[in-house]
């Protein structure tokens, strides 16, 4: 009986002095030690002024975040304004100096969107994706012009 009581106390002290601090340290590390992450930034629709500012900010935040180890750009865009596309192109080039940048083309990356994608380290496209030339202009005629 005395032996069992001593053994129980010894096991209790071992748990209290060794296992409990290790468990607490692990739990605390989950909150304070950053885990490696991959940022996913979507470029959807037309590339133009205020939308470009949003994407530029996301690229800058990903570049400055030490937990982010790489960036994936998901592109579904027919392109857009020349100056806006060029701005994003240079933002991606700047980000590429800090971290790997991968582009995933879903459905379409034409004109300015393809220009932005060319700044990445690697480009992946689905087999059915439409990938167009830089500088392509796509205009649908309005109904008024068709009637003439």
Q: What does each model-identified segment do?
A:
Residues 1-99, 108-148:
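Small-residue-centered hinge/linker elements
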């Amino acid at each position: 009986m005395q032996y069992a009581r001593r053994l129980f106390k010894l096991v209790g002290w071992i748990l209290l002095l060794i296992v409990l601090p290790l468990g607490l340290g692990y739990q605390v590390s989950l909150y304070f030690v950053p885990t490696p992450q991959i940022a996913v930034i979507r470029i959807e629709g037309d590339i133009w002024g205020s939308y470009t500012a949003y994407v530029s900010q996301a690229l800058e935040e990903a570049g400055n975040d030490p937990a982010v180890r790489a960036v994936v750009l998901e592109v579904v865009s027919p392109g857009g304004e020349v100056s806006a596309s060029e701005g994003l192109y240079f933002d991606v080039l700047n980000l590429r100096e800090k971290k790997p940048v991968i582009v995933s083309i879903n459905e379409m990356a034409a004109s300015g969107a393809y220009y932005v994608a060319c700044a990445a380290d690697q480009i992946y496209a689905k087999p059915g994706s439409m990938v167009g030339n830089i500088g392509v202009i796509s205009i649908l005629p309005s109904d008024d012009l068709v009637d003439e």
